[in-house]
């Protein structure tokens, strides 16, 4: 329970006591709510995203018993980075959800109980095609229905993706702790940071092409599976990774006087 929740409940209790005549006025009427912290998500630049994916590729073990496992984890993170997916979405994909002729993925029953069909960047579709060829050569006619298989007939585990992500982030020197400076929370890199980064970097590219990011926002929202484009706008607290890094450095070097 948050401090603000306690204040709200206590204020309501004393309002009741005032109505019953036990108090003349509410003793906590003027107690202010705490200011909510502003969260500054970690943003990867396009170059940092490329480095992260390269680091994951170099960590793929060539041993036959490990190769497909490591490649599967890489594919999951690739879809987070290049398609802005939530971490649960690639892990729940079935083989039949990939449509090679259309170069698209059908994402079913997402966070808001919505389905969506997304076109894939050509490079991503090529990687999926190559992955499926490797999978078939190593697993043969496997009965595992998941596009990204785990042990036996199960899907790839969320924690394996997170572990590989954090190892790669550390390997490229981008590991950062979560910091609270004043009323701003500077979040550490997480797999969800790739979704934030996808939104920020996509709109930046659109602006660089001379197009309107505002007009593109509803399309981006639909692609990312948001019910309202305002949910996507929530991700856009920074213009790019550089602006976020400059703010973090500035706030850290200019602490509030005590």
Regions found by a protein language model. Name each.
Residues 1-258:
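Conserved catalytic core of the tyrosine transesterase superfamily
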């Amino acid at each position: 329970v948050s401090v603000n929740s306690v204040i709200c409940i206590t204020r309501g209790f004393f309002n009741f006591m005032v109505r019953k005549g036990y108090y003349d006025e509410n003793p906590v009427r003027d107690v202010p709510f705490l200011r909510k912290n502003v969260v500054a998500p970690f943003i990867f630049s396009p170059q940092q995203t490329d480095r992260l994916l390269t680091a994951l590729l170099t960590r793929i073990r060539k041993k036959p018993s490990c190769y497909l496992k490591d490649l599967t984890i890489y594919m999951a993170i690739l879809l987070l980075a290049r398609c802005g997916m939530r971490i649960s979405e690639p892990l729940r994909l079935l083989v039949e959800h990939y449509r090679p002729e259309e170069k698209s993925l059908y994402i079913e029953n997402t966070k808001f109980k919505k389905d969506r069909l997304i076109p894939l960047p050509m490079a991503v579709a090529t990687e999926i095609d190559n992955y499926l060829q490797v999978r078939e050569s190593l697993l043969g006619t496997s009965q595992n229905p998941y596009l990204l298989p785990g042990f036996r007939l199960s899907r790839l585990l969320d924690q394996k993706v997170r572990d590989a992500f954090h190892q790669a982030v550390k390997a490229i020197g981008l590991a950062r702790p979560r910091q609270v400076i004043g009323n701003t929370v500077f979040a550490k890199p997480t797999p969800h940071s790739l979704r934030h980064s996808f939104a920020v970097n996509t709109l930046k590219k659109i602006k660089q092409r001379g197009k309107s990011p505002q007009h593109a926002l509803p399309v981006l929202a639909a692609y990312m599976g948001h019910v309202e484009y305002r949910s996507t706008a929530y991700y856009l607290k920074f213009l790019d990774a550089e602006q976020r890094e400059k703010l973090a450095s500035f706030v850290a070097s200019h602490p509030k006087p005590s």
